[in-house]
Amino acid sequence: MGARDTTRIEWDIPAFVRSVIKRLHGEGHQAYVVGGAVRDLCMGRPATDWDVTTSASPEEIRAVFEGLRSFSLKHETVTLVHKGRHYEVTTFRGPKRTLEDDLQHRDFTINAMAYDMRKSAVIDPWGGRRDIEKRVVRGVVSPEDRFREDPLRLIRAVRFAVELGFRIEEKTSRAISSMTETITTVSPERIRDEMIRVLVCENPSQGLHLLRETGLLVWILPELVEGGKGRGKVVDRVAPDPVLRLSALFCAGAQSASLDHGTKSDKTVNAVMGRFFFSKRMIRQVAKLVGAERAFADYHSSWSDGDLRRFIRKVGEENLETLISLRKANVTGLGKGAQGPLRRLKAFQARVRGLMRTPVVRGPQDLAIDGSKVMEIMRLSPGPEVGRILKHLSEELVEHPEWNTRTKLVAMLKKMKSPALTEHSESVDEIHGTAGRLKTRPQPKS
């Protein structure tokens, strides 16, 4: 066991955290600030995650804070809720149930420090402050033992290295490489959350490089092993938003054998994200952006304004800027070969700005008339025919959005009601894959 190194430091601990520790002390229990907050304060960074370790059992913790909202999601951890924020209070880890034993069973030395509020002292038995100065991520005592306790720590080592700009200590790195397969025993949800934190770091390419170098990536994302540095650099170039970074990760593999264009790429997005239980909404967002980025590769100046409006409608106006940044990130890595695609992208942006001066009709909901007006003009009863006519009108307005006025649409309906109705009915059926003529409401007897 390491020497109990204590260094006196005065820190401004949040009032609620102080009150938690004081109440535990008042009931005769030991209690210390521990983990990430101590690490961040030692580094001169603002601390955001305030955790407490204590000699009290979970039952004793709940008894001390009986009047406070709390819940337990993890073994021997009670989460206290105060003003919408969560604070974890955990019973000492390890068989001896001492502070030193608890710190020995933490993941890395930089996280294996505690703060004694009574003495204003940092307790550092395993050299965490030394490793902060050396800028290394080192497993506590035996990296293999720490990884066996929780294999998610294999990815956490990479994440801390990337987040903090540290390197992984050699013995710890070797342990990761020798134990990569154990990551398969961790729940997909936990892996997902840790991987997202890697992706939204300042340099996600470094995280992906470490995951590939250690051999972890082949167990986590075998579909995305191909691509090397190029894939990571694409992710680096987009804003640190989970949806955008995930989209960039998939788009960057456009030329790989495992990520083909079109339907196959959609299937890959759905398969990978589904495997890690991402929300359906997030899967749809990423799949839509990846599909649109691939479709954008086919953009040409010969596209008509209507073609471009259909593309905008399919992608969604709200996603256009995201799509453009995604496309720019993907083609920039082509080096000299990027000049042509970047010129096309600039021309695309200019055309889009011009077209967007007239609102795009996204569908029947944007028409200047509704179903009641269709039924009145066409003498129809409520039914699917009304919806088909509205959809047909919205399709017509893709080419001519300036026609989206009540007067013009009524005129179009009246024209459809004329002897040319049959022709229009057939065009509606052709567009929407339906058969048969429009059923008109019976004419009143004169």
Where would I find each of the regions flagged by the language model?
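Catalytic cores of the polymerase beta-like nucleotidyltransferase superfamily
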Residues: M1-S446
